[in-house]
Amino acid sequence: MNAGRGDELTVAEPTGPCAAASVSPRALPGPADPLLDLRLASLREEQPRESSPVTGPIPLRRRRIGDSSLLVFPVAINGTGFGRTIDAVSAGGILDAYRGFGGNFIDTSSAAAGGRSESIIGDWMRSRRARSDVVIATRVGSGTGSPGVSQAAISTAVDRCLERLGTDHVDLLYLDTDDPSVSFEETLLAVDALIGAGKVRFFGLAAHAENRLVEARVITAQLGVPPVVALQVHYSLLRRDLFEGTLAGVVAEQGLGVTARFPLGAGFLGGKYRSAVDLAACPRGRSAVTPPTRRRLRVLAVLSQIARERHVAPATVALAWLLAKPRVVAPVPGVSGPEQVLDLVAAPSVQLTRHEVAALDRVSS
């Protein structure tokens, strides 16, 4: 166990509200997808036993989120595209595949698709009777429903989240807006009230600088209320500056768990966009990494070389690099289809050597 990277546990027979079911996607309730089954089978065959031992559910490694009791699979599923670019049927297939591989950590936002993302996740949990198998994280504070971090705004936003999710609590609530016009005391007391009411188990921050993390720790100690346990931050091989440095130092000092947003650079690190021509031809590519700099293409080249040597996808290596970093509990990649899930959940099984990590560090610095 490496305390610098968060507590890790290998669970043989998971039980309890945070444990994932040890089942294959084919065994899950709901309509079968033979094309997905064939794709997953072919992907398994591509993984050599020595580097990515994928023969069914991924070995159930769990990481603890900060000082909480939440034990999660080291790769979360980003559900913010559900209801926007991903319809309910495709979202269900993604979640089925993820759960089938042992995944139990679903991340979304109250603002995603105007709340539709939470509704789709809630419908899926009900249809699969999966609420006790998964850890649900959502964010409040932005969007049009109940924006802001005042006591009234947070309380209203969480109640609406719970209604859409069809549950009586969220496991991890992030505040994704930092509003200096609202006292931090009011915001933190509002969260404390929700925790006391059983509507929220733990909370984190998602749009806050290091000085606000320090301030939050001081205020929660003075008020005697639960502290921040997690930070969600934009962090990837393409964007290291927002986290590494002073912010990472504060996170380590406070023992927070980090979840990394945009860990694949909006798809660029998945290897789809291998040239400036590819990027120019794809609107998503242009919006993700404009301009297509030489540095970014060099990062992709080194990433792809390591992936080829290990017989895994570039996305798998990009996530494995993050998982090798201190305090990172789980990257939160987006996914557009069930066939992509294996490349993501395979990342915890890929233990990069220090030379591979160093090569990626150098090219991305």
Residue ranges of each PLM-predicted region?
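Beta/alpha (TIM)-barrel catalytic core signal, keyed to glycine-rich beta->alpha loops juxtaposed to Asp/Glu
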Residues: T15, A20, L28, A32-L35, ...
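Active-site groove signature of glycoside hydrolases
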Residues: L162-S183
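Short acidic capping loops at alpha-helix termini that bridge into adjacent secondary structure
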Residues: F73-P74, D107, R131-V134, D168-L172, ...
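Active-site mouth loops of central-metabolism enzymes
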Residues: N78-V89, V140-A152, D176-S181
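A short, structured active-site edge motif that brings together acidic residues
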Residues: S132-T144, L231-Y235
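Short, acidic/polar
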Residues: I86-Y98, V149-L165, L213-V218
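N-terminal binding-site loop/beta-alpha segment at the start of enzyme catalytic domains
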Residues: G4-V134
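Acidic (Asp/Glu)-rich catalytic clusters
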Residues: G66-S69, G100, G122-D133, L162-G166, ...
